[in-house]
């Protein structure tokens, strides 16, 4: 009897604690549709000399379509090259199982905006929104990402 109670308690605890609800930073519903977005997380960071670049991801859903919001931040005391997104831009994620997931940028050109901070650094902020192709979201659930490649308007970067 003790074992049955312990097993029942374990199963109930496991089911209730197994998955926490998704926390949204944006959750909007209006006459146009619905939009939900999660918190941004830093995915990649590169530092070399006085140059640094950061990539942040957040998941979003717009009217039932899953999206990946990408925020590129480049900092430098020297020249900061503009990496532009356009309708031909793509984000490739190679998984540990060898498969490659391709995300397609929405039909919107964006080269970011330049800001200078109080320390004399030029900061380029470039946002982008990528759409998941059919069944690619399911592949991401099965295997972790090993390499990320971004195809910009004029360049490709790993």
PLM regions and their residue ranges:
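A generic "folded-domain core" signal
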Residues: 19-158
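Bacterial Sec-dependent N-terminal signal peptides
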Residues: 1-24
